[in-house]
Amino acid sequence: MKKNWYLIIAAILLVIGGITYGYHEYNKPKTAQELKTVRVAYLPITHALPVFATKELETADGPVHVELVKYGSWPELMDALNTGKVDAASVLVELGVKAREQGIDVRAAALGHTEGNIIIVNNDINSVQDLKGKSFAIPHKQSTQKILVDLMLEKAGLTEKDVQIVEMSPPEMPSALSVGQIAGYSVAEPFGSLALEMGTGKVFEDPDHLWHDNICCALVFNGQFVDEHHDLAKAFTKAYLDAGTYLDEHPKAQEEISSKYMKFNDSVIERSLKVIGFKDLALTEDRYNALVHHMTHIDLIKKVPSYSEFVDTSLLP
């Protein structure tokens, strides 16, 4: 009996010790690096290149330390952003607008790129009419790719009743096209260039002809992070925009950084970078209005967040 009491007391002391240790660990002063760390979520696509470049260009004595967090799907990434598991993300701008419409506090600061989307079909498709009765893939319903496909169909006098639109992870699209599971897809690079490299698809419509100056991914912050660490969020935004300028002025760096974060052949990376820009990353009111016009037109949103509700201009340099 006495032995049992010793075991009980020992267990209690162990629990108390663990709680005490955890308390001190939680409350111990943060290091200088921890105080300037921004956790940024991304998917490995060319649209996230400014995030990668921000990380590559950071210095030990700089104002920001970037902690990149890789995700495999947009829903998973968006959940992390909405719940504060990450502080910011390079994400489909439509997902950010939709979250804001739903009352979730996320705020955009800048675009991730200009252009950079591609529409691919298999080699037997020669007109939009040829897509009738076939499947066409997009990465997410709330996406510029979805808008582009709807505009393409509308231009040809077709609707989604004529073509089956399916959501599919971008890495799966080239192989799905090659085996005939889908007739085409709209996606962020480099997954379009990959199909061209494989010889299983061809470029179809020019996205810019469907929606001039179309926008896609954006730098979006968790609102609570901005409120609690406004200066840090602003410092990161400046570093991010500076990284975009650096990429625009150093094409070779685009290839080198892309190759580090995206495991594709050099020829795929090189081609994908020919159709994307990083110089003008401003999410202007005109660009936002065009975006929400298209989102409303195809019923992606019902209640449009105002520009000031979604874009936090206080974060701009």
Label each PLM-derived region with a short phrase:
Residues 58-64, 209-211, 278-285:
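Short, solvent-exposed loop/beta-turn-alpha elements that line the ligand-binding surface or hinge
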Residues 93-95, 166, 171-258:
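Pocket-lining segment of extracytoplasmic ligand-binding domains
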Residues 227-302:
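Secondary-structure end/capping motifs
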Residues 296-317:
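Conserved C-terminal helix/tail region of periplasmic/extracytoplasmic solute-binding proteins
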